[in-house]
């Protein structure tokens, strides 16, 4: 588990590292822990099944979740946060906030159909 607070800032790529979809990055500093994006993996059925495997990062200790923009590969798994024990605020622009309900509904439909 990546729940320790580091002595200096660390960045851990949890998705979209060497690939395009599934954006998720953990930023840890001595002052807090922030997840940047929590997106869907898309492509093959095997890729999409990866959406069911969530990294063990101590979700209940996350201080904030930042959504960079309203594409499912960046925000498609935001709806999982309460189930993971994460009650951190989700921070984004107003335009992204306005689009999130529609994007998350679409994300849920994609997951139900394909996985």
Identify the residue ranges that each predicted region occupies.
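Extreme N-terminal starter segment of soluble prokaryotic enzymes
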Residues: 7-12
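Pre-active-site segment of Zn-dependent metallo-hydrolases
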Residues: 17-22, 29-67, 71-88, 92-98, ...
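A short acidic-Thr-Gly-centered motif at the start of a beta-strand
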Residues: 3-4, 25-27
């Amino acid at each position: 588990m990546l729940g320790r607070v580091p002595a200096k800032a660390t960045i851990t790529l949890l998705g979209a590292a060497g690939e395009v979809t599934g954006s998720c990055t953990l930023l840890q500093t001595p002052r807090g822990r922030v997840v940047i994006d929590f997106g869907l993996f898309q492509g093959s059925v095997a890729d999409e099944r990866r959406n069911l495997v969530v990294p063990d990062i101590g979700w209940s200790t996350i201080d904030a979740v930042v959504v960079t923009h309203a594409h499912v590969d960046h925000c498609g798994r935001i709806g999982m946060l309460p189930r993971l024990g994460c009650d951190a605020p989700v921070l984004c622009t107003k335009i992204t906030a306005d689009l999130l309900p529609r994007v998350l509904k679409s994300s849920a439909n994609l997951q139900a159909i394909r996985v």
